[in-house]
Amino acid sequence: MRHYEIMVILDSSLEERTVAPSLDTYLNVIRTAGGSVEKTDVWGRRRLAYEIDKKTEGIYAVIDLQATPAAVAELDRQLRLNESVLRTKVIRPEVR
């Protein structure tokens, strides 16, 4: 298991209170593969640095998790298929 951090930018037309439950359904991919979700932090609605799909605002969420590379790849694939997800970024933070 490796430590990953995933940043997700969602469409600003969603209600902020529904973001965490909707992300939780996608995070079941990690849980069924034996991984664990350590923290889900919803930053809220923020202005984008540049337009994405003609949108200037998005709802940011950061997820810390422990999982296998295959499980994270499947999660990223499923998030990209969702039309309300504007961008995703998966990183492995350096251990200090």
Swiss-Prot record:
Sorted UniProt keywords: Ribonucleoprotein, Ribosomal protein, RNA-binding, rRNA-binding
A single GO cellular-component term on record: ribonucleoprotein complex
Signal peptide: none
Pfam families xref list: Ribosomal_S6 (PF01250)
Superkingdom to which the source organism belongs: Bacteria
Recorded GO MF terms: small ribosomal subunit rRNA binding; structural constituent of ribosome
GO biological process: translation
Function: Binds together with bS18 to 16S ribosomal RNA.
PANTHER family: MITOCHONDRIAL 28S RIBOSOMAL PROTEIN S6, SMALL RIBOSOMAL SUBUNIT PROTEIN BS6M
Family label: Belongs to the bacterial ribosomal protein bS6 family.
Name assigned to this protein: Small ribosomal subunit protein bS6
Organism, scientific name: Salinispora tropica (strain ATCC BAA-916 / DSM 44818 / JCM 13857 / NBRC 105044 / CNB-440)
Lineage, opening ranks: Bacteria, Bacillati, Actinomycetota, Actinomycetes, Micromonosporales
